[in-house]
């Protein structure tokens, strides 16, 4: 190997170039030997993956277990809200609050909830008989203790000019029934049975009372409707597989019965399928629990795996036909597996970072762990199982066997004597091949379309201005969408869209969004409640809220009773002996914790209830309330915490859910920068960074405009977008920067001709496979469909429209290749002239 120093080039440039050449050729040599090994032992590399799939696949069926804790999956794992819940629960145990109206403070436990909605224009308050019948039927249910804790009104119309806010009419009533399970396993089973019967009863009552609309919710409803997505999607996933199999088979076919590879397209998709089954088996063997977010793994793995399949097929077509099939396999591996190894490594790095301890959402972490295993197995199965299939197909081609019927192809003379239909079925393309076209694979319909039609059109000088305008429009909409990103802390985004939970949530949002959930305000340190300055501080903290406070009620009681309690002993004495013994104030006993030291009593902790006035965007406003109250707990003299069960899901959710994609993006950027001087041409990495950034921001902005929130599913799709873009842009870009044609236009044509077929095959199969997801009635699958559709569409747009045009404007320049060729041609002409002068007879003979 010889390296010539370019005039004026520094020595470091020579060493970097040598290092890049050595690394590249080393990787190519390794992949070449790997291809030779597979071609010499195809049975072994076919058998081992099959045995692994059977072993782990059977174990997956035996160990399948769904995840039952939805909060563990989708709520931030490490949040202040969980610490606050523990503190609140230790101060005020849940079983002491079941008889309270405002008891939904720590965690609801087991409960049943129903909304009764009157027809449009009617007053629910006039439907008393139906309400009482529903309530009475619930109270008569057995197998569990219950307590009626009250009702709330929705869609309220007040009496005009009423000072005491009297209610004129209402559209809906909400009733909640709490069960006392006390943490016992037996009681919990009884509570679960009661909830099931409760939901059945509400459905039955709906049939009996057509004049009312009933919407029920129980504590297990969210988990049930979350898991329902997987049940609804089973048949659609199978349809997706059939569509991908069909697309891969058809796109791998040719008229040439010898060189057509329909079964290889089919076997390539099946290779990815069995690798996914093996990964699932490993997941369940390691005590993993299934959840509906894992529904995206087959689509993610298929998008990467089939890319390797189609690239290997394209690499096979680029090899020389006159070589033995084993050498052709080795050459295809040397050509394709270097890039595929790099992209698989980036998949592993990005999803590995998503599975790191920095990820605060358990569903994202579990998904990324499974994706890492799937990528490793995918890579192993592609070069082993599919490689063995390619070996057998190559052997059949070398021995001139039909690619479908596996019979000997007759000679041209024999075919000429047969009917046209027989010639069509058994033709190996000998009539189409001419001395001008030595590569029969050029007749593949996609490659023919790209070479003869598309390449000339996209590089036309009159098309380029329209492509630039198209990209500016694309960038504008993407930027506009990126400015409107909203977090997806609403758990409804992960549920089946036609489920009872979603119906209940929609009605609740419509009629009960005027007030926030009840927020517990916990004072966890002793406080001088009798001090006027402390009283003023409490009033300022509670200003802007509707407060249900024992402190305020006690102050009013003292004022009405004309009793003075300006010191500690009087304040506590009157509180215990008079205030808390009155029937209308007895429910405040559970809100105050007393301690006794000798004859002296102290208040060591207490709680108040706050309700905020909200609008339709209830969730966002509650998050703002939480963010405003927490800093006050540190800056004020009163030490307190605020808590509601919804805080567990909303606490820094936007930060928790965006961290994985930021880490993954940083990982990709870091890897590409670190390898900037190790790849064969640094400009390849530079263009790759720009392309991936453009695609990622495009998907992010467009999905926001398509009403997709930043929940755990969309974040996983954004991580996948990084890798999907690299997977498809990297071969195209590196082929372009290494091309030695005279002009950039010729280089991009050559790149599209080499890799355009594989890219188009894979993206088309990927997008067609997404179509059945559109028919799954689930918000989770809608999000998955939208994000992956944008991922495939933006990648296709960049590979076939934007990059082919922009690469003709910007570096790398191809002039030095042109100068080298001119110098060589001039040198050759001088040598020929010398030969002509010295040997004129020879020239005359020629």
Curated annotation (Swiss-Prot):
Q: Which domain of life is it from?
A: Eukaryota
Which residues carry attached sugars according to the database record?
Answer: 762
Q: Where does it localize?
A: Membrane
Q: Looking at the keywords, is Hydrolase present?
A: no
Please name the Pfam families in this protein's record.
Patched
* Keywords carried by this UniProt record: Glycoprotein, Membrane, Transmembrane, Transmembrane helix
Protein's organism: Homo sapiens (Human)
Q: How does it sit in the membrane?
A: Multi-pass membrane protein
Protein name in the entry: Patched domain-containing protein 4
Q: What does this protein do?
A: Could act as a repressor of canonical hedgehog signaling by antagonizing the effects of SMO, as suggested by down-regulation of hedgehog target genes, including GLI1, PTCH1, and PTCH2 in PTCHD4-expressing cells.
Span-the-membrane segments of this chain are: 41-61, 230-250, 265-285, 293-313, 336-356, 373-393, 465-485, 660-680, 686-706, 718-738, 765-785, 787-807
Q: Which family does it belong to?
A: Belongs to the patched family.
Residue ranges constituting the SSD domain according to the UniProt record: 233-392
Q: Does this entry carry the keyword Methyltransferase?
A: no
Q: What induces it?
A: Induced by TP53.
Major localization class: membrane
Give a Gene Ontology cellular component term annotated to this protein. membrane
